[in-house]
Amino acid sequence: MSHISADDVRKVAKLARLNLPDDKIATYTGQLESILGYVSQLEQVDTTGVPETTRAVEVTNVTRQDGVDPTPVREEILNQAPQREGDFFRVPKILAD
């Protein structure tokens, strides 16, 4: 594992367009070293025979067969309306003239 310097932290912050105050440099230096140490451990894991993937759990779409369902008759639907005007539902007016 390589050592992370304060200049490395400043460079990463600049590349990420982060305004990093000088009093936080030491904190972030330690945190970046810790992260890279963990990545170094992961690099040593033998993954021979493990298929490549982009996620831990596979995502599948739940689908159903398309089918034609009978459509209710318009007159049956309109007859259930509290108020009706011809072939339309009558609803209270909500917009001013």
Swiss-Prot record:
GO terms for molecular function: asparaginyl-tRNA synthase (glutamine-hydrolyzing) activity; ATP binding; glutaminyl-tRNA synthase (glutamine-hydrolyzing) activity. Its EC number is 6.3.5.-. The keyword Protein biosynthesis applies. It catalyses: L-glutamyl-tRNA(Gln) + L-glutamine + ATP + H2O = L-glutaminyl-tRNA(Gln) + L-glutamate + ADP + phosphate + H(+); L-aspartyl-tRNA(Asn) + L-glutamine + ATP + H2O = L-asparaginyl-tRNA(Asn) + L-glutamate + ADP + phosphate + 2 H(+). It is an enzyme of class 6 (ligase). Pfam families: GatC. GO terms for biological process: glutaminyl-tRNAGln biosynthesis via transamidation; regulation of translational fidelity; translation. Keywords: ATP-binding, Ligase, Nucleotide-binding, Protein biosynthesis. It comes from the Bacteria. InterPro entries: Asp/Glu-ADT_sf_sub_c, GatC. Allows the formation of correctly charged Asn-tRNA(Asn) or Gln-tRNA(Gln) through the transamidation of misacylated Asp-tRNA(Asn) or Glu-tRNA(Gln) in organisms which lack either or both of asparaginyl-tRNA or glutaminyl-tRNA synthetases. The reaction takes place in the presence of glutamine and ATP through an activated phospho-Asp-tRNA(Asn) or phospho-Glu-tRNA(Gln). Heterotrimer of A, B and C subunits. Belongs to the GatC family. This is Aspartyl/glutamyl-tRNA(Asn/Gln) amidotransferase subunit C.
